[in-house]
Amino acid sequence: MKKTDTLPTTLSALIQEYSIAEGIQMAEQQVRENPAKALCRHSLFQLLCVAGDWSRALHQLQLCARMEANYTQEARLYRELVRCEMFRHTVFQGEQRPGFLLPQPVWVESLLAALACHDDTGEVDKHRNTALEAITDTGGQWNGGAFDWASDSDSRLGPVLELVTGGVYIWLPFSQIRSLESPQPTRLTDLLWKPVNITLVNGDTHGAWLFTRYSGSESASDALRLCRETAWQDGPGETTVRALGQKVWLTSHGDISLLDMAHCTFHAQENDGA
């Protein structure tokens, strides 16, 4: 291990100086030295989440809740987020379907059909092209800048927001969103899931959690796991672009990082695409 074996005072400082693996080793050492200190276990929990070691992460958080009652609600929340993260993976494998808040536009079914085709490139492209032909652009504004259209940089999603609300993994088309409000990240787990308040085109409001990191990033490099960059891989087929790392939307006026997004409005109609 490089530099010093003393754990930095904040996780932010730790991940600037050490690899995730080194950080986990140091946090584990702190837990061994202070087994009854919930804060040490909470630091280990956050690092294990970044590494995608879901079962160990939840175990540490459950121990925190047993030690200090103020962790009980957080333990319940992150059990839901981790469960939805694992379910999310099966959706991208074409094995499960996401939930929806409103009746989905017909093109969403084409995106899901493309996922179910796996590596049959002809069918993947056929279904995704069908979706692309049916999608209508949704403009809006974010953090003070305007755009005429927006889409996730991972083509498997297109103009769809991934989120968790009510313990369910949701796909929400941009055309069904009126506004998003999300604070700046303050903790390590915000690199995976960030709180957001959503207003839909029908006026309904939801407290939810955005996915700020792409599915599968837990197995990538530290730079991608920590959302310091985004990487893309083409294929299978001509229409597939898979992303890892920090979640990014492409727009007509530049890219939007979901980590940096504080406020976004969409110029959508209630019946768009349905």
Spans of model-derived segments:
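Structural register within alpha-helical repeat arrays
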Residues: 10, 43-44, 79, 106, ...
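Inward-facing hydrophobic residues that define packing positions of alpha-helical scaffold repeats
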Residues: 27, 61, 128-129
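Short coil turns that delineate tetratricopeptide repeat
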Residues: 35, 69-70
